[in-house]
């Protein structure tokens, strides 16, 4: 007998409120055929590769920290195109349109030769090598060694009109019922998102964690990151950003391999399960009495990675990149007339060794006690951009989206909403500065707040470095050739009459 039964599955209904749709910039931005070239000066920095060298009182930094394993976060300032002296003022109507810049291409130039720089720690928490052991040995109260290694090889850059967002693991707050019982226990972890600032450290093979908080012994990582937070760009959140301002596009190349295999010194926090937790003989069989293996060794294994070969065949820098289609809704429009370029590159990681004598006179014999060794690291950058002039119509639906995205843009365009005055009649005193009248009202002028003032960037001002002569610059010539804007000279054909030869008579 056939019976009809109702469907037992769940029925999914669409949401009742309308979902706000964010328009792509291509839907309301009109691009012109006017392109500008912008190029920075040669940007140089010199410092110590591991830490800041401070004065004796510790209040003043005498030599800054400049490492090849740091991020370089450039904040490039461009002129306001609405206040720009255009060659053709009929390009737009200021009563119905506003001008913005669009990034059409860029090139990140890097100077200095390729090189591998090592890092390390004079008291590195390395009990011993665990790859090739000849005997089973236990640890002592202090097994730290002077160890160095080369970091993971990283080449990366992120381009957007707001700072790049990074992610790292940090200590999480402890629940209230467990706050009094945390001594000797591993703290809870949480993933945090922060802005990648200039000078933040790159992950060099030990993970993107806050070493300042999570490395109590100050010996688990190298000197350059032991008191720092290693960050990694949060590509997932930037790719899913509703406006797509943080990352128009990015390029990334990372490589590493495990070169050495070590084990940490100290007690194991999470011991190998044994009979004390009802897991006897499930992970290992105990050794006989009297054997060295009777006391189980440390199981906190870790590798020191290596970036391996550094070659000019795999360079992301000193070559142009053209932006045709961004990954988000913002297709290269530079809101706020600024562009953020976040760079990480440790393929030019050579550290200079500089030696000086501590004696004033002439030195005739070598004595290491009279010689001081210094470390310095240098970096060289140059940024070049191709900027396209674009127009935005002052329509209600366009202004509504821009106001929801960033109301400061409309204020910069002098399109702020003026509130209705509460009282049309005000009191105006003559001789307001005299002693016969009341004190003048102190009206504090409200300055425009910089939303990124609390962050550290390498500021690059290009407000006076724009040019229409693209063919006068290397990146401009590449752009002209790539986009087919080059005017080819016409070939002039001339007809030349060749006199006919005289026929010879046969004899």
From Swiss-Prot:
SUPFAM superfamilies, A to Z: Group I dsDNA viruses
Compartment list: Virion; Host nucleus
A single Gene Ontology CC term: host cell nucleus
Claim: Disulfide bond is one of the keywords in the record: yes
Domain of life of the organism encoding this protein: Viruses
GO biological process: endocytosis involved in viral entry into host cell; virion attachment to host cell
Bias-annotated ranges (Polar residues): 132-147
Keyword terms of this UniProt record: Capsid protein, Disulfide bond, Host nucleus, Host-virus interaction, Late protein, T=7 icosahedral capsid protein, Viral attachment to host cell, Viral penetration into host cytoplasm, Virion, Virus endocytosis by host, Virus entry into host cell
Region (Disordered): 120-147
GO molecular function: structural molecule activity
Known role: Forms an icosahedral capsid with a T=7 symmetry and a 50 nm diameter. The capsid is composed of 72 pentamers linked to each other by disulfide bonds and associated with L2 proteins. Binds to heparan sulfate proteoglycans on cell surface of basal layer keratinocytes to provide initial virion attachment. This binding mediates a conformational change in the virus capsid that facilitates efficient infection. The virion enters the host cell via endocytosis. During virus trafficking, L1 protein dissociates from the viral DNA and the genomic DNA is released to the host nucleus.
Subunit structure: Self-assembles into homopentamers. The capsid has an icosahedral symmetry and consists of 72 capsomers, with each capsomer being a pentamer of L1. Interacts with the minor capsid protein L2; this interaction is necessary for viral genome encapsidation. Interacts with protein E2; this interaction enhances E2-dependent replication and transcription activation.
Record-stated family: Belongs to the papillomaviridae L1 protein family.
Record protein name field: Major capsid protein L1
